């Protein structure tokens, strides 16, 4: 600071400035970026920035900004800035140097200069020296010394344990044991014991159960110094996390000088610092000291001591001011600069550089600057920007898949619910007729046989055959002539619309006019649209040409205009413009069209794609190219590209329609600006250049026989409107081409048709004038046009007849509608507008007056406060359960399959879930079929991404329950979630640019790779611990020299020349787009504990989340409920993975090699089955098989196939299936090396957004896009699903895996899955495919089995004596089991698997036949569809061949779903996500389209059995789907799924209604549970222990009938005594049971009674299981004892068990032969007691016992037998003689 006359005032100003800045900082939002830019950029350069604060945060930010943005500018201006922090640079700030002693100063006295030992020379009085005053110099405050304490054993124990369990030292209680802190993880516990043993060289017995403090007390011989383990941790901390040069010595020095810690306390702090290790290496010393400060601070709190850090700059109130003579300072600077300049000259001479060339370079730069300044003065930035080139043929979008859009439109039309008559009038209908092909006719012929589509199909078929479309595509204008209509309604609102023009016939009749009639009408003796020919210098009306033109219009409105084979360039065809309608007409006529756009292709591609899909006719083609008509280079490059045969299209243009325009509204002659010049350049100058470039190309190639037709867009506006810049001049300038046609030499190459464009309503230039159009027509007798009408006019000018004339002479087409020549046009328009506005205001005033009058007459309106605010819809997030209507509705139209299907071996899906780039299956489905999120979708994703969380408590002093913002804690209304977070959600979900924080910091722009280098010079010495140094020596041998450091355990290391190092390098990797999970996704939000998340690979937590959610989808609140119905060994876990735990594998290989911290048990997490193990340990607790398939991309299908096999072979009854894989850099890099994935860099250069880069079946596809996640299904036997009352989403009818062939390419797609259609020629005629035939054969087999059962039962009963009565039940059950098994085998043989009888039938056909379906009933094919060239074609070929071989009806194509266009390719999870999507399609009847398939590859046109929808199609219902998956390594898979309604046709109405009721009850119960747990973050319910105790484990495992019971708390566990439960195998009906008992037991009872000589009485009872109401608590309490209820509660089927006991009580009562007390008498006095495997015993109480005693009954025996629908009991009462 320069010394002023009044130093105190300067100090006061500085003080005030500092206070103001700090006040501003605290009071207002931080705007540091703007502030620092202003400070750095200002003219009076600031060279010294000082930050006052606890650390150098802002100084570092400013330093980075200056280096990044102002480095070159500072270099030119020789600016050298300093960035200092008050916390770290106090000495530099106060100019305090090591050799300088602090200056003492007295209070309130100015600083005096120090006395000199020699007298100073006298100074001139008139010129006092200017002095430079330095800042006040503080007195340093020393750190307070703290008594030193030795490092204790407990410090080391806590440090080692805390480091291992990843907690800070002060978060580990010394009173807890290692076992407690390990949370039951034996591996972690074992590892800790091993480390402590290595550290202390011996541990006491049972160390894991001792408190840490007790354990530490055993180490009485502890040396007070870190041992092997602790020392290694400290060394690793310093080596891996401290900045360069910040070694142990510096750490200790800092702790001593700044905190006053002694050597031993420093060691303790280092030990504790290990437990707080930073996540990455600290950037600089400032961060390192901050880290140490935080450790010391927490250490002080733990040690109970007050630690005070030395103040860096504590100073007295005043201090001395050092003064330096300014003249001396300037002299010193001058000498330094001269010296540096001499050094520069010497170095330049030595290096052979031109050291004096700089002035000339400066001069050149100055001249360039002057030229730029002159340009800016003449034009401006807008003009320069407007001329920039944007033409890039790589960004071209090409559309030519008319064949697929026609098929797609026909399918959508047939499935549309609108009446056929309405469809006939639609543009889609007319477009289909124009795009006719044999394939469409075949599709209609097939649909005409279907009742749901018959009417539409036959009508369209008749129309097409009658119209004769064999002549090729035409553009036919079918719209009525439209007129503008402007109305002012009663409220004063101006309403504009367009209505058909009508012609009156008498008073009450009118007819709609066609457009040709309207334009042919006369106006001033000429039609509204007419042609003129040259007459001297003028253009005169030409009758002959006009008649020709009007005839062409009539033809275009009737038979149509053909443009087949024409090649046209159109510039300026935005949405709603005339150009867009011209393009539509050309495409409908079969033309090849190039359209240019000045916008990014990704912005306009959707609209052009839709345009082509609507009208693109056979042979038509649309190419969209970026192009700026204001750029000369673009004009030249565009035409060159069109004509170039090598790199371009090799076209010769038939027409050019240059309609590109730039609006200049509001610019009069005094406001002509650069935009006007730019518009003039685009609409005139460069339009002429375009024509010139075409002429050059045609002349170069000798194309002088086919002139290109030029449609000039002229205008009747010759300044009439005014205020439109140079627009009129641009249009008038084009008219010179009429004369140049003759005066210049290009008439052989170009012909001119000038079209004067009339008033066209609704276009960009004229839309503001729509409301005055009617007034103009009425008052001036002119004709205005709609955009389609004007386009029709222009398309008629492109006919061959008109062109023939134009070849010889330019044509002038007046399409102005009479507007040309109207005088005072602007005034007339203004008058009409003024009248409309006036009418509007008058009516508004009348309305206001009327309201005021009503208010006066009827009183005031109700207070606003009484008006209820509008209700806002709330989100309702719930599992998407399948709808269940009544039995007749569900089975309507289906063949009856009752009793035909073996349900025990039929696989159904009862639950599913997923986790992927679009979140859950619910949110993914919304995006997949709708392309947008609902309120529920936004809410769920906002929760999933951590943007909101649920709150229940006091918020701002008021009770509040609902969502709050996770950061601000402000309440969030669900209706506002889309507005608040919508853009963030859409930007951070789905396929997008990789976010490093979601992939462990992986940034593809800095992909790290190791590079080997050999050093050629000795490196500077560095300090390292002894052990590390010896390791260097061991690796590098004599290339490393070690030198001990006196007084230290460390050594000095010198690396000699010749040593080989691996040095990291970074490179940009071009695969930087992927489908990551939504940003902010956190497994702890689901309820997974943090220690589990830290332990396992991310892929495992994906599986845990998905399996947990799949249970809710199945209606299961607790997975243990499954064990009420199955044995724990009957649940299989078949979830697979393609690659396994990538992060865990990285730890095993890379991180371990790089000596980074890695958990010791990382190996277990890298195993493929680790996720299955964790799922079972934390959630399922099953003892069934764990099968871990790895089928690369087909893993999920292989998992499903394994599960189906397990259920069908009765090895399991329930299975968890699916797949999971992660996205990490290693696999991404290797897929890129294989060229399998899309090159994101190339894709961006082509103009594709990240979300568009996965384009299955598109002609532009270039590889798949990786993604990550998991997909899960819960499958089980249909029998079990019906028994449990679980929702059934679909039937898995068939699954198969297949290899391919001999080869050398592992990833090559194969055709092995063709074998699913393997079939002989005659097999399709097999009677086994006839349901009725199979039913007859099955009935025969079942009847035979029933006869056998009846015979055996009679034989058994007849031979059983009363003494053997107790064994009767078991023997009968055995017979029933055999019979039931034989019936199921018969069902399996005659229905489920008819290929056992005839293996020549195709597996797919046989699977469909089970349900009465054929291959024609498969409606949807979910494709693997990876977006690679090879896969998509191969997959289409395979499916098409299968359908052809199986004789699928031609004209009945499959609708193809390509899900990966939305999700990317998750490898292992792919098939599971696809399967989930298919289940959702079955449930809704919706087939989602592939929105990224902008143009389906023409190579797929040959596959007639396939349609590739790009838009969603709503069907009336889907019967069946097929899914294919192709994985690297010859893993082909196929699954066929069927709608669940076909399963319900196999059961009776009563059984279905019972099932339906239980399913609905289950759903009603689970939905609030799901929502509550989601809000509370407890979706994942971790299991702490199995359903059995350790004592029960053996009994549970060995008892096949062991089942859990539900406790009063709702939990499931095995009863204390695991008793056998009655088998659930019997399959007799009630009628069978009654018949058997009536015939068999009668004989047995007679024999028994006769044998007992009359002392036995018998009771028999049969009860329907469904008749016993187990929900009636009063009934249960009156009739059953607590013991009976407890036993029944623990049985697999509580209702069946209670029904059996009720039948037994009734039978016993009958056997006692005592008087009845009525039907309502309680039965509690009769108790049935079960004792394990023994027959039940009977206990009588109270009145029942008294009655039995009176009857001298000494013993009562009972036998209970169950069937699926009934319970039967026989009781024998034996009396005393």
From Swiss-Prot:
O-(pantetheine 4'-phosphoryl)serine modification, residue list: 186
Gene3D superfamilies: 3.30.70.2490, 3.40.47.10, 3.90.25.70, 4'-phosphopantetheinyl transferase domain, 6.10.140.1410, NAD(P)-binding Rossmann-like Domain
Primary role: Fatty acid synthase alpha subunit; part of the gene cluster that mediates the biosynthesis of oryzines, natural products with an unusual maleidride backbone. The two subunits of the fungal fatty acid synthase oryfasA and oryfasB probably form octenoic acid. This fatty acid is most likely activated by the acyl-CoA ligase oryP to give octenyl-CoA before the citrate synthase-like protein oryE catalyzes condensation with oxaloacetate to form tricarboxylic acid.
Compositional bias annotation for Low complexity: 110-120
Segments forming domain Ketosynthase family 3 (KS3): 1007-1539
GO biological process, one term: long-chain fatty acid biosynthetic process
Gene Ontology CC annotation, any one: fatty acid synthase complex
Keyword Iron annotated: no
Family statement: Belongs to the thiolase-like superfamily. Fungal fatty acid synthetase subunit alpha family.
Protein name (Swiss-Prot/TrEMBL): Fatty acid synthase subunit alpha
């Amino acid at each position: 600071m320069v010394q002023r006359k009044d130093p105190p005032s300067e100090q006061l100003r500085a003080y005030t400035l500092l206070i103001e800045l700090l006040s501003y900082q605290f009071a207002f939002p931080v705007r540091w970026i703007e502030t620092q830019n202003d400070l750095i950029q200002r003219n009076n350069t600031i060279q010294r920035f000082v930050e006052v604060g606890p650390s150098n945060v802002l100084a570092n930010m400013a330093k980075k900004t200056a280096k990044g943005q102002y480095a070159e500018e500072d270099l030119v201006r020789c600016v050298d800035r300093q960035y200092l922090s008050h916390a770290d640079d106090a000495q530099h700030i106060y100019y305090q140097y090591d050799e300088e002693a602090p200056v003492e100063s007295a209070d309130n006295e100015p600083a005096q200069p120090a006395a000199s030992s020699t007298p100073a020379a006298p100074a001139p009085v008139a010129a006092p020296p200017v002095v430079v005053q330095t800042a006040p110099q503080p007195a340093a405050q020393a750190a307070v010394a703290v008594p030193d304490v030795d490092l204790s054993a407990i410090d080391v124990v806590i440090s080692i344990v805390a480091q291992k369990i990843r907690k800070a030292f002060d978060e580990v209680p010394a009173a807890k044991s290692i076992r407690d802190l390990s949370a039951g993880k034996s591996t972690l516990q074992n590892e800790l014991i091993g480390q402590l043993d290595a550290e202390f060289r011996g541990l006491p017995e049972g160390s894991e159960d001792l408190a840490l403090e007790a354990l530490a007390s055993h180490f009485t011989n502890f040396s007070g110094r870190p041992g092997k383990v602790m020392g290694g941790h400290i060394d690793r901390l310093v080596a891996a996390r401290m900045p360069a040069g910040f070694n142990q010595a510096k750490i200790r020095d800092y702790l001593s000088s700044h905190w006053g810690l002694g050597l031993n306390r420093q060691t303790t702090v280092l030990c504790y610092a290990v437990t707080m290790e930073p996540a990455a290496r600290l950037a600089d010393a400032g961060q390192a000291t901050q880290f140490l400060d935080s450790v010391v601070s927490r250490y002080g709190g733990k040690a109970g001591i007050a630690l005070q850090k030395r103040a860096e700059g504590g100073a007295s109130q005043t201090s001395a001011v050092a003064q330096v003579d300014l003249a001396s300072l300037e002299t010193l600077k001058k000498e330094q600069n001269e010296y540096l300049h001499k050094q520069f000259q010497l170095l330049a001479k030595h290096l052979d550089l031109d050291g004096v060339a700089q002035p000339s370079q400066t001069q050149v730069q100055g001249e360039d600057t002057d030229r730029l300044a002159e340009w800016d003065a003449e034009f401006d930035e807008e003009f320069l920007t407007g001329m920039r080139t944007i033409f890039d043929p790589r960004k071209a979008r090409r559309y030519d898949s008319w064949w697929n859009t026609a098929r797609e439109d026909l399918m959508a039309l047939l499935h549309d619910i609108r009446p056929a008559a309405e469809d006939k009038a639609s543009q889609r209908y007319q477009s289909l007729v124009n795009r006719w092909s044999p394939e469409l006719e075949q599709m209609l012929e097939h649909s005409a046989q279907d009742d749901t589509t018959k009417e539409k199909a036959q009508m369209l078929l008749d129309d097409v055959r009658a119209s004769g479309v064999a002549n090729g595509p035409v553009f036919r204008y079918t719209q009525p002539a439209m007129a503008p209509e402007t109305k002012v309604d009663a409220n004063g609102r101006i309403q504009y619309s367009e209505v058909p023009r009508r012609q009156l016939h008498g008073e009450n009749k009118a007819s709609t006019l066609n457009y040709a009639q309207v334009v042919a009408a006369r106006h001033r003796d000429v039609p509204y649209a007419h042609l003129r020919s040259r007459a001297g210098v003028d253009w005169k009306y030409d009758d002959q040409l006009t008649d020709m033109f009007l005839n062409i219009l009539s033809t275009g409105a009737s038979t149509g205009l053909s443009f087949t084979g024409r090649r046209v360039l159109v510039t300026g065809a935005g949405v709603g413009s005339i150009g867009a309608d011209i393009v539509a007409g050309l495409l409908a006529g079969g033309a090849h069209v190039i359209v240019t756009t000045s916008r990014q292709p990704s912005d306009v591609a959707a609209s052009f794609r839709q345009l082509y899909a609507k009208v693109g006719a056979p042979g038509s083609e649309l190419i969209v190219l970026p192009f700026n008509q204001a750029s000369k280079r673009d004009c030249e490059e565009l035409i060159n590209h069109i004509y170039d045969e090598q790199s371009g299209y090799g076209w010769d243009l038939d027409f050019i329609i240059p309609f590109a325009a730039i609006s200049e509204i509001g610019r009069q002659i005094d406001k002509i600006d650069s935009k006007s010049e730019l518009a003039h350049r685009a609409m005139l100058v460069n339009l002429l250049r375009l024509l010139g470039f075409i002429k050059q190309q045609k002349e170069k190639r000798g194309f002088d026989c086919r002139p290109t037709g030029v449609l000039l867009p002229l205008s009747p506006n010759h300044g009439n409107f005014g205020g439109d810049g140079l627009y009129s001049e641009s249009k008038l300038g084009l008219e010179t081409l009429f004369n140049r046609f003759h005066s210049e030499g290009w008439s052989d190459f170009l012909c001119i048709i000038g079209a004067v464009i009339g008033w066209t309503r609704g276009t960009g230039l004229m839309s503001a004038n729509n409301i005055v159009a009617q007034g103009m027509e009425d008052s001036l007798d002119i004709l205005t046009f709609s955009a389609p009408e004007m386009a029709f006019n222009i398309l008629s000018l492109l006919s061959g007849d008109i062109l023939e004339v134009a070849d010889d002479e330019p044509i002038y087409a007046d399409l102005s509608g009479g507007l040309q020549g109207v005088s005072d046009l602007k005034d007339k328009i203004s008058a009409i507008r003024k009248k409309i506005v006036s009418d509007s205001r008058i009516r508004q005033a009348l309305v206001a007056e009327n309201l005021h009058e009503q208010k006066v007459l009827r009183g005031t309106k109700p207070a606003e406060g009484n008006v209820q605010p509008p209700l806002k819809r709330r989100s309702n997030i719930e599992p998407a359960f399948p709808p269940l209507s009544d039995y007749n509705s569900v089975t309507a139209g289906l063949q009856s399959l009752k009793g035909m299907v073996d349900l025990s071996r039929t696989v159904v899906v009862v639950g599913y879930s997923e986790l992927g780039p679009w979140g859950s299956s619910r949110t993914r489905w919304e995006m997949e079929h709708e392309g947008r999120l609902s309120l529920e979708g936004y809410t769920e994703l906002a929760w999933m991404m951590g943007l909101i969380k649920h709150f229940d408590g006091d918020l701002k002093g008021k009770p509040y329950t609902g969502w709050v913002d996770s950061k601000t804690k402000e309440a969030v209304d669900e209706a506002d979630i889309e507005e608040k977070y919508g853009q963030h959600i859409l930007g951070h979900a789905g396929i997008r640019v990789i976010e490093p924080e979601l992939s462990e910091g992986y940034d593809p722009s800095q992909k790290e790779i190791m590079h080997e280098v050999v050093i050629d010079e000795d490196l500077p010495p560095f300090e390292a611990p002894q052990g590390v140094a010896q390791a260097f020596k061991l690796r590098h041998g004599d290339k490393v020299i070690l030198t001990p450091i006196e007084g230290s355990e460390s050594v000095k290391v010198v690396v000699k020349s010749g040593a080989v190092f691996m040095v990291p390098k970074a490179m940009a990797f071009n695969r930087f787009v992927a489908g990551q999970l939504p940003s902010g996704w956190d497994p702890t939000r689901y309820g997974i504990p943090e220690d589990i998340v830290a332990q396992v690979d991310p892929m495992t937590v994906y599986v845990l989340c998905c399996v947990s959610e799949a249970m809710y989808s199945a209606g299961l609140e607790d997975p243990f409920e499954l064990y009420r119905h199955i044995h724990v060994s009957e649940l299989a876990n078949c979830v697979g993975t393609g690659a396994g735990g990538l992060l865990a594998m990285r730890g095993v290989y890379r991180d371990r090699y790089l000596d980074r911290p890695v958990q010791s048990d990382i190996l277990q997490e890298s195993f493929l089955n680790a996720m299955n193990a964790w799922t079972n340990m934390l959630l399922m607790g099953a003892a069934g098989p764990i099968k871990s398939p790895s089928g690369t991309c087909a893993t999920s299908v292989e998992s499903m196939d394994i599960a189906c096999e397990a259920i069908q072979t009765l090895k399991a009854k329930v299975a968890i299936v699916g797949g999971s894989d992660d996205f990490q850099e290693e696999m991404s890099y290797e897929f890129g090396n294989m060229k399998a994935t899309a090159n994101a860099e190339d894709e961006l250069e082509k103009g594709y957004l990240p979300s568009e880069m996965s384009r299955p079946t598109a002609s532009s596809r270039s590889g798949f896009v990786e993604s990550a996640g998991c997909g899960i299904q819960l499958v089980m036997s249909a029998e079990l699903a019906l028994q449990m009352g679980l929702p059934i989403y679909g039937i898995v009818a068939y699954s198969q895996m297949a290899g391919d062939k001999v080869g050398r390419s592992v990833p090559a797609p194969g055709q092995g899955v063709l074998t699913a259609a393997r079939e002989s020629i005659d097999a399709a005629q097999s009677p086994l495919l006839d349901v009725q035939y199979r039913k007859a054969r099955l009935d025969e087999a079942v009847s035979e089995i029933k006869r056998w059962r009846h015979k055996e039962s009679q034989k058994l009963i007849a031979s059983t004596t009363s003494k053997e009565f107790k064994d009767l039940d078991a023997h009968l059950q055995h017979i029933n089991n055999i019979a039931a098994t034989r019936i199921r085998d018969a069902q399996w043989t005659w229905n489920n698997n008819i290929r056992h009888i005839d293996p020549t039938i195709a597996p797919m056909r046989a699977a469909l036949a089970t349900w009465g379906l054929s291959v024609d009933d498969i409606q949807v094919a979910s494709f693997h569809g990876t977006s690679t060239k090879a896969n998509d074609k191969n997959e289409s070929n395979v499916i098409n061949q299968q359908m052809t071989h199986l004789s699928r009806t031609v004209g009945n194509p499959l609708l193809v779903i390509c899900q990966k266009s939305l999700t990317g390719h998750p490898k292992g999870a792919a098939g599971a996500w696809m399967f989930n999507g298919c289940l959702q399609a079955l449930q809704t009847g919706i087939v989602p389209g592939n929105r990224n398939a902008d143009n389906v590859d023409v190579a797929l046109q040959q596959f007639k059995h396939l349609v590739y929808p790009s838009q969603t199609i709503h069907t009336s219902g889907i019967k069946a789907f097929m899914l294919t998956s192709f994985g690297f390594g010859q893993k082909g898979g196929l699954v066929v799924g069927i709608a669940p309604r076909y399963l319900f046709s196999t059961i009776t109405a009563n059984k279905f209604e019972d099932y339906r009721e239980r399913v609905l009850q289950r759903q009603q119960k689970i939905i609030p549970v799901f929502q509550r747990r989601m809000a509370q973050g407890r979706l994942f319910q971790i299991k702490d222990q199995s359903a059995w105790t350790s004592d029960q484990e053996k009994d549970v495992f060995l008892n096949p009938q062991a089942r859990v019971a539900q406790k009063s708390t709702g939990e499931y566990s095995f009863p204390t005594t695991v008793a056998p439960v009655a088998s659930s195998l019997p399959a007799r009906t009630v009628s069978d049971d009654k018949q058997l008992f009536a015939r068999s037991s009668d004989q047995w009872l007679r024999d028994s009674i006769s044998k007992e000589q009359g002392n036995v009485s018998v009771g028999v009872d049969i009860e329907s299981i469904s008749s016993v109401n187990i929900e009636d608590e009063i009934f249960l309490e009156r009739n059953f004892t607590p013991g009976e209820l407890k036993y029944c509660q623990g049985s697999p089927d509580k209702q069946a068990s209670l029904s059996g006991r009720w039948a037994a009580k009734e039978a016993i009562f009958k056997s006692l032969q005592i008087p009845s007390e009525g039907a309502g008498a309680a039965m509690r006095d009769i108790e049935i007691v079960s004792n394990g495997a023994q027959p039940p015993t009977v206990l009588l109480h109270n009145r029942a016992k008294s009655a039995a005693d009176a009857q001298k009954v000494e013993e009562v025996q009972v036998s209970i037998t169950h069937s699926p629908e009934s319970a039967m009991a026989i009781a024998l009462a034996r009396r005393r003689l």
